[in-house]
Amino acid sequence: MAEETYAVLKTNLGDITIQLFPNHAPKTVRNFVELAEGTREYTDPNTGKPGSGPYFDGTIFHRIIPGFMIQGGDPLGQGFGGPGYTFDDEIHPDLRFDKKYLLAMANAGTRGGHGTNGSQFFITVSTPAHLNGKHTIFGEVVGEESKKVVDTIANVRTGAQDRPVEPVVLQSVTIESRQA
């Protein structure tokens, strides 16, 4: 039996279980897993010094657009923070934004011919076909309870710049291997 990799995002509004796609986006999944587990070197954007420990723990979902997506992974909580490095997209032809609850990398397009992926990610609550070929899809939310949590987060009250009025906290990310 093959093993599958899952990420469990524990939030203050419930847990979200995501099946990761290492066969379709190996660099992206490795980056996410290593940041989640605290085994990847990064630069703390608050201090400019080397960071250590689980990267995502205690961060917030800083951008929520009802009917579109929820976005997190920025330790600054503003939408412009990252781990101090970037990497290219891994666009796979089998993965398209043709269903809800997909996990993808948030980025700022390409700069100098290179990708701008770092640590920020989003989960869709729609089918944004206009994002095909522009953002690496590297996982999918599984289970009805997890999908309900995503929907709950996607419908919290927001203010300026799509920021939640009450913080939606990503308390921890746990990586699990399960038999297929």
Mark where each language-model region is.
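Cyclophilin-like peptidyl-prolyl cis-trans isomerases
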Residues: 1-180
